[in-house]
Amino acid sequence: EEQVRVIPVIRELAKKGVAISVDTMRATTAKLAVEAGATIVNDVSGGAADPEMFSTVAKLGCKYTLMHWRGHSKDMNEKAIYGDVVSEVIEEISIQLDKALAAGVKRENIILDPGIGFAKNPEHNWEVLNRIDEFVALGYPVLIGHSRKRFLGGDHPDEREEATVAVTQSLVGKGIWAVRVHGVKANVEAIRS
């Protein structure tokens, strides 16, 4: 089902020269997506959901976003228990990072995502953002996906756009490779101001 939905769209976008990142935890989908024109595989499981993901990405030679993950969304809130969230997330993401490198994923193809909103309560998310320099210090590009997430407040995602822009603006100059947002124009304007 995932492949039926995304592969035809990727093919059409690639024909138009659009840069494409595919969001999947499945190695087979990642392979087909890259063959169809995607250039980045964004794996929210950080390689934990599919044992074939790292070897597949290594063979494909594409960019790979490795996100911190403690399990599927149905039970991730129960797993939001940390002593020191930043140290533990770095430790856990480093384990997956070592596995990716051992499987042959090239260092220059890896992008790290600390997993804002995944197995983290609001305080954890803010702590990660406040200490983002510790992730940047790992020496990999860092992607932050904070857009419209619950920890920003508001009952509806649209009510979180202003806070999304404020967080984006706060990340300027901190060595972040990219932010993943919904309201692109407002975030670009915030970065340029």
Residue ranges of model-derived segments:
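Active-site metal-binding loops of divalent metal-dependent hydrolases
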Residues: 116
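Phosphate/pyrophosphate-binding loops at sites that engage ATP/ADP/AMP, CoA/4′-phosphopantetheine
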Residues: 96-109
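Active-site-adjacent loop and "lid" segments of alpha/beta metabolic enzymes
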Residues: 1-19, 25-28, 34-35, 39-99, ...
